[in-house]
A protein has these predicted regions:
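Start-transfer (signal-anchor) and selected internal transmembrane alpha helices
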Residues: 1-61, 153-165, 258-266, 404, ...
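Perimembrane helix-loop-helix junctions
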Residues: 5, 235-268, 296
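Hydrophobic, aromatic-rich transmembrane alpha-helices
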Residues: 34-37, 338, 348, 352-400, ...
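Transmembrane-helix motifs of polytopic, lipid-linked glycan transferases
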Residues: 122-154, 198, 202
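Transmembrane-helix signature of polytopic, membrane-embedded enzymes
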Residues: 140-174, 194, 209-217, 408, ...
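Signature aromatic-anchored transmembrane alpha helix within multi-pass, membrane-resident enzymes
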Residues: 159-166, 264-272, 401-411, 415, ...
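Membrane-interface transmembrane helices that cradle and orient dolichyl/undecaprenyl
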Residues: 191, 196-215, 249-250
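Membrane-interface alpha helices of multi-pass inner-membrane proteins
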Residues: 201, 214-229, 236, 240, ...
Length: 490
């Protein structure tokens, strides 16, 4: 049985991802090993520093929250000890309930059952980030496989250079790295990213071979992701719509109906699972924020709620969040005895219609600062799809256009996960991870279009690769150094 399962995934999963390209296989394995080693080293350093600080206990920054929640689940409850919630209690019937999902708790079950481990948020964050980075690298490979099925590239050497730059940006430059801090807050976001990327990966593989199991894996991934971080449910909804759109064109009625139903399931079951957990915890489909202990007790939050008409989400926060998450000057390179980077302290931007002090800001970096190569690829992606689309269509037939449209729709679906952080009352560096799926797909597809349609020009072949290499290496450096800096001030 194991042999048949292994043979199945070899023929239908890895074949789609790598498509027999030895260079891509070797590059992905090497960068995967390098990036996971760096993640492990960074987190080990962060964990040791936090654990050795005086006055830090196992409940600090929700480090023990998910283990505590699992112990409650095993006893048929969903409440947690108030000290484990670390000031994040929703007080209902004199019991403390946390708003964080149950996936990170359930993922601890095998380790608790086998090794009897308790309170190990620190180790789980390593696992979540390794899954995130490796899944991101596989998404890059699968996108290249789908694209190269239809198009030849500008030249072998340039194509390999562009591919390596995207792999670097998907590993050492990945926004998931900004979740590399030993805390339950960061871990929940890291798992949300990991399962969102896995869901996208399985959808891409399904598109190539139309085998049902990969849509089932997509559904499972998004359910787990949604119960780690709600933004994953938004991505799942739009990915499900894309699957439905593809399924409608299937010539076989039985397969069309099957994939249509699975697409509906992907769109709605993840969000329904969140609503169910909320109902079991709070007795309502959406938690009342005025039951949160900090809203009535903390003057800071009381003032914010008063200024915004007691809202925690809304378009009133959109303009301020857009500026904060995309401003290009959010990182300072501070040269002292050791070169390090830090987010600017003056990045708080209360922009109309938001009133001053009407939002919660932490010191945060931005997408354009951390991934400058993304800015270039975003411009390429938009330009080729808006300005040059008519010229592009002359070079492709209907089958190829269908593949390109699918890839574009997947980009739009992955971009849906940024909606929640953009309309949320709080702005934090860890929320940058929510932008990760959209950044990864736009960066990869932009690079493919760049490789095909930009590097055909002799002038661009001489200048643009140098610019991209500089941007990529600079972004990877900023990403890693910012994690190190934030860890030291954590």
């Amino acid at each position: 049985m194991l042999k048949s399962i292994s043979s199945f995934f070899k023929n239908h999963f890895f074949l789609v991802i790598f498509a027999g390209d030895k260079f891509r296989i070797k590059s992905t394995i090497i960068l995967g090993m390098l990036s996971t080693s760096i993640i492990t080293f960074l987190l080990h350093e962060q964990i040791q520093r936090v654990s050795s600080r005086p006055g830090i206990d196992e409940n600090w920054m929700l480090r023990n929250y998910f283990t505590n929640q699992l112990n409650s689940i095993l006893n048929g409850r969903l409440d947690v000890e108030s000290n484990a919630a670390w000031g994040e209690c929703f007080n209902i019937n004199e019991l403390c309930y946390g708003y964080h999902g149950i996936t990170p708790s359930l993922l601890r079950l095998p380790l608790i059952a086998v090794f009897k481990w308790q309170g190990f948020t620190d180790q789980m964050i390593v696992f979540s980030l390794v899954v995130s980075i490796l899944s991101s690298l596989l998404v890059v490979n699968s996108l290249w496989t789908i694209f190269h099925k239809n198009f030849t590239v500008s030249s072998r050497n340039y194509s390999r250079t562009i591919f390596l730059l995207v792999l670097l940006s998907a590993s050492l430059g990945n926004l998931a790295m900004q979740a590399a801090l030993p805390s339950g807050y960061w871990e929940a976001i890291a798992w949300g990213y990991a399962f969102s990327i896995l869901g996208i990966l399985f959808t891409l593989v399904w598109y190539c071979n139309r085998i049902k199991i990969f849509l089932v894996l997509t559904l499972i991934s998004f359910i787990l992701g949604a119960n780690s971080r709600m933004t994953s449910a938004i991505t799942a909804f739009f990915v499900g719509i894309v699957v439905i759109g593809v399924a409608r064109k299937h010539p076989n009625l039985k397969l069309r109906s099957r994939d249509f139903i699975l697409g509906l399931s992907i769109a709605f079951i993840p969000v329904l699972s969140i609503i169910l957990v909320f109902y079991l915890k709070f007795g309502t489909f959406l938690p009342d924020y005025f039951l949160h202990q900090q809203i009535p007790e903390n003057p800071f939050w009381a003032n914010i709620m008063n200024l915004n008409g007691n809202k925690t989400t809304g378009l009133i926060f959109l303009t301020s969040n857009i500026v904060a998450y995309f401003r290009p000057d959010s990182i300072i390179i501070d040269g002292t005895s050791v070169l390090f980077v830090r987010p600017t302290m003056d990045s708080y931007s209360y922009i109309w219609p938001l009133k001053k002090d009407g939002m919660y800001f932490e010191s945060s970096s931005s997408v354009s600062s951390l991934i400058p190569i993304f800015v270039v690829m975003f411009i390429v992606f938009v330009s080729l799809n808006v300005i040059w689309w008519k010229d592009l269509k002359r070079e492709i037939n209907q089958a190829i256009e269908s593949d390109l449209n699918f890839l574009k729709y997947m980009v739009f679906a992955s971009s849906a996960c940024i909606l929640l952080p953009l309309i949320y009352v709080g702005n934090s560096n860890r929320y940058l991870v929510d932008f990760g799926p959209a950044v990864l797909l736009i960066l990869t597809l932009g690079s493919l279009l760049f490789d095909k349609f930009i590097l055909n020009n002799k002038w661009s072949r001489k200048i643009l690769p140098t610019i991209l290499i500089t941007f990529c290496l600079y972004g990877c450096f900023l990403n890693l150094m910012l994690v190190r800096t934030l860890g030291r001030s954590f």
